[in-house]
């Protein structure tokens, strides 16, 4: 058994999730690969596996039960947070992980190939690239935890939206001023997240066109 298996299992249960042993094992394989590649490719500033478990895996898992179903785009995915974690837990969901950083996408593509994952692809491009917009089309859910600015994220997501699409933004503090700027066009539901062993404010913002 993986040394972090029980810790991840207990953490996910505290988040209200009932993940299978297979899903937990896949998540830990992903973390092991991230730790290994991080030594050479600097994929994340977090190097301690125990800290990674909390700040990457559990943090990403904290939004899982609040995400609507459907095809998902993760913008600025970096090393795959939260997109890869969602894909591993929900094999029925089609996921596209998008980032402009070649090293990070190379890591994700290799991991996808090694595990023969069928529901997720990684694409190296900029979110505003018109060819990318034309090729990928529209999504039901668009996630990100990379954008400092909510308005920037909404602007980047806009070409990928259909009428019912949900923008799911992972934030620390609630960006009240930015929400005010967007309220004429988007409804916004704020969900307070409680990540086990993380003593920081975390929120999920679910935005939808009015």
UniProtKB/Swiss-Prot annotation:
It catalyses: guanosine(527) in 16S rRNA + S-adenosyl-L-methionine = N(7)-methylguanosine(527) in 16S rRNA + S-adenosyl-L-homocysteine. It is found in: Cytoplasm. Its main location: cytoplasm. One of its GO terms (cellular component) is cytosol. GO terms for molecular function: rRNA (guanine-N7-)-methyltransferase activity. S-adenosyl-L-methionine binds at residues 76, 81, 127-128, 145. Keywords: Cytoplasm, Methyltransferase, rRNA processing, S-adenosyl-L-methionine, Transferase. Its EC number is 2.1.1.170. Gene3D superfamilies: Vaccinia Virus protein VP39 (3.40.50.150). It comes from the Bacteria. It is an enzyme of class 2 (transferase). Pfam families: GidB (PF02527). NCBIfam families: rsmG_gidB. Specifically methylates the N7 position of guanine in position 527 of 16S rRNA. Belongs to the methyltransferase superfamily. RNA methyltransferase RsmG family. This is Ribosomal RNA small subunit methyltransferase G. The lineage of its organism: Bacteria, Pseudomonadati, Pseudomonadota, Gammaproteobacteria, Moraxellales.
């Amino acid at each position: 058994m993986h040394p972090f298996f029980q810790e991840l299992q207990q953490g996910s249960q505290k988040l209200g999730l009932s993940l299978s042993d297979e899903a937990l094992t896949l998540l830990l394989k992903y973390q092991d690969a991230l730790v290994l590649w991080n030594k050479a490719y600097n994929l994340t500033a977090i190097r301690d596996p125990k800290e990674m478990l909390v700040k990457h895996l559990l943090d990403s898992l904290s939004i899982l039960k609040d995400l609507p179903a459907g095809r998902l785009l993760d913008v600025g995915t970096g090393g795959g947070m939260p997109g890869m974690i969602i894909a591993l837990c929900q094999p029925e969901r089609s996921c596209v992980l998008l980032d402009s950083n070649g090293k990070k996408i190379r890591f994700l593509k290799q991991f996808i190939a090694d595990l023969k994952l069928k529901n997720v692809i990684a694409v190296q491009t900029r979110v505003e690239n018109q060819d990318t917009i034309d090729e990928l089309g529209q999504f039901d859910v668009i996630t990100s935890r990379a954008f400092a600015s909510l308005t920037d994220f909404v602007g980047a997501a806009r070409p990928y939206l259909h009428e019912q699409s949900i923008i799911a933004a992972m934030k620390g503090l609630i960006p009240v001023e930015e929400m005010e700027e967007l309220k004429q066009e988007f409804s916004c539901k704020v969900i307070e997240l409680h990540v086990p062993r993380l003593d920081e404010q975390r929120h999920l913002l679910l935005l939808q066109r009015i």
